[in-house]
Amino acid sequence: MRIVGSSQTNVVMDAELKRVAQRAIGVRTPNPRKEGLGQIIVPFDRDLAWAAVTYMRTPTRVLWDVARTTAERLEPLYDDLLRDLLEDKRTLWRDGDGISVEARHVENFPAGERQIVGTVKNAIIDAARRRGATLHLDPDRPTLRWIARQDDRGEMVLSIDLGGGSLSQRGWRREAGEAPLREHLAAVLLMLARFDPRKDTLVDPMCGAGTIPIEALHAGRGVPRTPSSPQARAALKALGLNGPKSGPPEPLFADSQPLVIGCDVDLGVLGAARDNAYEAGVDKEVVWQRADARSLSPALVTDIAREKGREVRSGLILSNPPYGERLDDEDLYGLYRGLAEACRRFRGQPWRAGFIVGTPLFEEAFFDVLGRPRIKKPLANANLRAYFYLYELQ
């Protein structure tokens, strides 16, 4: 089983897989084999595959590698895949299923992408027919998505996309905002910042579309993805990956009730974030506060907590501030400097502050106020090179 995420997230995905496997199905996973900077590979197990697709939040895809070949021409590619699929006696499809096939990273194969897709499609459909099942091509609404790609060694690997598409799409986003943070990357930030929903109050001072607050609540509770993903349901059902228990999957940490606060200076942005939270089922659980990020203070957080009958024990400031697309360098530096000053007000308390930013101006502004970060990690955000910074404020 191949778990795929953004670059530089191998360690995070491994940690999440171990936690999910232990909580959801009561097993310890072996140490994975890492491939590149954004993929981990573990032996395929049906219950583990179900748990990964249902509960993991940091990957973009979960794949089941079912065949591979060193073929360098279309004819042997067809022959090798057909042979592997005929010899594999596991459930790989259901009679009558629609499939789609896509080719990725096949630039070094001596044939065009469409030729590769057609060859792979023929091998799958022919193998299914010889095993007693009839499949048909349905690129728009497939039950199973098949992916053929060349790995780092030049081998062609054929996989089934167990999630039925991108796992980053949770199904709740109605308003994206001007510079949305992808959902899986928000989950990565929460892991890197060591968010503990049992005791941490989370504050996003520039919440935008609300991705971080929404993801904090879902990740904190271990909310299953499946109810909002018909593609994942169809794929899991077709492969007989139904999990160890009957009935719909339950949250892994149902009693988790973290205090989560989303702030923004723009009322329209806050309204859009609230709409997204409504679609995600957490609109009544996120506290939305109109506030300039530079005015954030412990007193504001304490007042909000008191209104909710909560106590602030420790906290995490986590945000995806602007990178400068609509601000000149002077204004951007001033914004970052004001944000750093706001974080400094939490000094002496058990708080941390984490940010994903794509400009060196951020580190310069924060260094003048808070010094060096405890963690500086490269990450990619929407194909932009960025860094995650974590500051210890206590």
Located regions from the model:
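Non-catalytic nucleic-acid substrate-recognition regions in nucleic-acid-modifying enzymes
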Residues: 1-142
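Conserved Class I SAM-dependent methyltransferase catalytic core
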Residues: 1-8, 12-16, 20, 263-272, ...
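A short, flexible beta-alpha/helix-coil linker loop
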Residues: 106-109, 166, 322-326
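C-terminal edge-of-domain segments
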Residues: 146-163
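SAM-dependent Rossmann-like transferase core, predominantly class I methyltransferases
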Residues: 158-194
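Conserved S-adenosyl-L-methionine
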Residues: 181-298
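SAM-dependent methyltransferase catalytic-core segment centered on the flexible catalytic loop
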Residues: 223, 227-247, 306-317, 322-360
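Short conserved loop adjoining the S-adenosyl-L-methionine
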Residues: 295-311
